[in-house]
Amino acid sequence: MPVISIWRGCVLMASCGITFCSMGQIDPFSRELIQVGYNLALQGHPPLSGYAFYYLNKPNFFNTNLTLRLAVAPTYMDSELGISHALSEYTDLGIGLAGGGFADNYAEIRQGRYLQGESFTGYGGEVSLSIYHLFNPASKIPLNGVIRGIAHYSTYSRDDRTAPDFALAKDHGTFSVRTGLRWGGREPTLFPSLAMELSAWYEGSFRTENETYGFGDRKLEPQSHLLWGAALLAYTLPEWKHSFYLSLTAGTSVEADRFSTYRLGALLPMVAEYPLSLPGYYYQEISAKDFGLLGLNYIIPLDEKQRWNFNGTLTTAVVSYLPGLEQPGNSHTGVGVTSNRVSGANSVSTSR
């Protein structure tokens, strides 16, 4: 495999899980983790996909009202400084900085085929400002509101297999706003023992460029709008110590393009705050403008201290495709088998 292709795959492993750092409120607990995950395709030739990063959450960072959240991969870094009670007793502020190499790579996958001639390398950096508000401080189940503004800049370059006549998307800035309500929530761990959540979100993205690219057949939309909701329930049976994790995520979009649409596929549970997992498929294989995704995980401990666990995953999705990236049928189902260790996960997924 040529050198640039190797680097693209290796850095995807490093960077695609960094959105783990983007949470809905300031985490009050001290955490220091190493997360490793890899998605192996048993057939075909997809782009390598996975993540490897060091995660730190440090309350009382130089001051009692400061919390540092940091995720570091070999070529990418994502961080946020949380300031508790910055605007009021129950309103916090977060200042974020992220960036590095290969973070904005784009892999074209159409009809289940990875098209390297239409794929390219991307680099990016961003700053963000977030406001977190707790609406019901006296309640056992918190209701949090989030408003986040993001300024992101992306640059693109060819790799060794990009087609010579394929025009790259122009370097551009993207200004985004995300807002949402979350009732409940989950700890930022692989599979929490107890959790519940109901949440609703909106994200609008506004770009500085809206030119065509590729073979003149695709376009950067000047603005895109995403709306989605999520529900989850996690519980551990007290006698058996078996756990289940049930989740439902659904979303729609307006004027989405290849860079802003929902992309489903693979089994990488720490790849995002709301991972669109579909085991047995390539990472981000399915591009959907609308979707519904139902997932069930059942976790069985393999030793008394629960350092090793067996995890079975079943997910099913109904999608409406982004134009130009359609696949046969509008429903997809995947089954996955994973062995998990406290410090990471090695996973093998069955074919669809």
Residue ranges of predicted features:
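Outer-membrane beta-barrel initiation region
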Residues: 2, 22-99, 103-106, 173-193, ...
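C-terminal outer-membrane beta-barrel translocator/porin domains of Gram-negative envelope proteins
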Residues: 26-30, 36, 174-314, 322
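Transmembrane beta-barrel strands of outer-membrane/channel proteins
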Residues: 36-40, 66-72, 93-111, 145-153, ...
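Outer-membrane beta-barrel translocator/channel fold
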Residues: 94-138, 349-351
